[in-house]
Structure formats: C-alpha cells, structure tokens
Amino acid sequence: MHAYVYKSQRKQDTFVYLATRDDFSGLPAAVQAQLAPFTFVLDVALTPERRLAQADAATVREALGKHGFYLQLPKTIVLAGECDYD
C-alpha cells in the first residue's frame, strides 16, 4: 500500500497521509478548514517492515483502508515547570 504525505501549512509538525494522491475528499471539512493548505512531501510504500518516524505503519495502513486518510499530529512536550504536582 502507498501513502501520499502532505504537510499542513498552518500547523507545524502536522501531516495528512492519503490513500490516493491529491484526494482530500475523505478528509473532514473541519480538518481541512484548520490545516489547509497542504504541501506534498512524500510518497511512501507502507510495507509491514516500514518504520515511520512518528506513527506506526500498521495503524496508518488501517486508517487509510477504513477512512482514506491518517492524521499525524505533533507530540506535546510538557516541561517540568509547567506541571502541577499537587
């Protein structure tokens, strides 16, 4: 299975994987409104051996098969000074 990866121009470190190149029709309108425009960055073969930097390839394949897209959001980093330990 192939995935076509697009980077959001509005949200840093946010990517959309599509099952079909340039086919954003399955992406919910609310997601498109918040993240578009997108820039194409990568065409990747999602083989069982494939390792992705921020996502599990099997999870991405499953989402592409069910929904036609996978949304990769940035990981949140919490600094020790921002934590409430009470």
From Swiss-Prot:
Coiled coil: none
Superkingdom to which the source organism belongs: Bacteria
Source organism per UniProt: Xanthomonas axonopodis pv. citri (strain 306)
Protein name, per record: YcgL domain-containing protein XAC4085
InterPro entries: YcgL-like_sf, YcgL_dom
Domain YcgL: 1-83
Transmembrane segments: none
Pfam families tied to this protein: YcgL
